[in-house]
Amino acid sequence: MKDWLFRIATCSIMTFSSLAAAQAEPLDVVATFSIIGDFAAKVGGDRIRLNVLVGPDSDTHVYEPRPADAIALAGADVVLTNGLEFEGFLTRLIAASGTDAAVATLTDGVETMEEPGGGHYHYIDGKAVFHAGAHDPHAWQAVPNAKVYVQNIAAAFCAADAEGCAAYQANAARYIGELDALDTEIRAAIAALPQDRRTVVVAHNAFRYFEAAYGVHFLSPQGVSTESEAAAADVAGLIREIRARNASAIFAENISDTRLLEQIAREAGLPLAGTLYSDALSGPDGPASNYIAMMRHNAGAIAAALAAR
């Protein structure tokens, strides 16, 4: 009797241990910034353990890696990156970490846009900081491109975890359905606006893919610094363009300094109409805590500001 009970107990323990071991080994995934992290979570679900390097409301262009980031990469199975020179820190971080993880570039397959000036500016502490790059990296700002990101993530996860491939593909298909509905929603919101009232001003040139997909024109103070001698003339030139194009609103961005935009708003006689989310999500309690919420917030804020003029 005791032997029988012992065998049952032993089998139960071994079975439980095997199941626990199977469930205790999720795919270790590193995503470079918050938007990609959200895509990864949607596709991976509970089969992945996710580490996001650049968090909400943070600028990936100027991010300085920490020792913990190298440790995360060293233990990763998959690293998800935007590519197009968006993550300037990543090459040296990969080298420092010694990781042998698969690196998936999520813009592969996207029809990318060239940077007209060989790069674009960010505004940090009132100064214009140039980010060089041959192609505009902000491809996620058009929802059809986000679908490519999601497909690439599913492919990367399937390559690293064949047993979970069906789950990854099902998650991706379900999420792509949500993205299709979002794309339709944004197109309808912008289509309701008059053609001559579709221009806004933003802090940096991060919305060209949104512009091409949805028909809103974005102006930005490229290269203007609040501390430069040429700032007054540059701002005056931008204000002339704002008036010529009948721009109706100025938006701050969650990752950019607002001082220059406040100056432009005063001189152009336009309101600061709110905040758009360009290169990072908001925190969990903000209006852009995931990609769909971010795009819905941006499109809604733009449509409301332009309709009110």
Swiss-Prot record:
* Biological process per Gene Ontology, one example term: cell adhesion
Per UniProt, the keywords (alphabetical) are: Disulfide bond, Ion transport, Metal-binding, Periplasm, Signal, Transport, Zinc, Zinc transport
Q: Which cysteines are joined by disulfide bonds?
A: C158-C165
The recorded induction information for this protein reads: Up-regulated upon zinc starvation.
Q: Where in the cell is it found?
A: Periplasm
Q: Which GO terms describe its molecular function?
A: zinc ion binding
- Tell me which species this is from: Paracoccus denitrificans (strain Pd 1222)
Family, similarity comment: Belongs to the bacterial solute-binding protein 9 family.
User: What outcome follows a substitution of D125A?
Assistant: No defect in zinc binding from solution. No defect in zinc acquisition from chaperone AztD
Signal peptide region: 1-24
A Pfam family reported for this protein in Swiss-Prot or TrEMBL: ZnuA
Broad class of the protein's primary localization: periplasm
Describe its assembly.
Monomer.
Please identify the protein, giving its name as recorded: High-affinity zinc uptake system protein AztC
Where on this chain does Zn(2+) bind? H61, H138, H204, D279
Region Z-loop, residue ranges: 222-229
Q: Where is this region: D-loop?
A: 117-132
Q: What does this protein do?
A: Part of the ATP-binding cassette (ABC) transport system AztABCD involved in zinc import. Binds zinc with high affinity and specificity and delivers it to the membrane permease for translocation into the cytoplasm.
Q: Which cellular component, as a GO term, is one annotated location?
A: periplasmic space
Q: Which domain of life is it from?
A: Bacteria
Listed result of changing Y121A: No defect in zinc binding from solution. No defect in zinc acquisition from chaperone AztD
Instruction: Relay the domain remarks.
Output: The D-loop is required for the efficient acquisition of Zn(2+) from chaperone AztD.
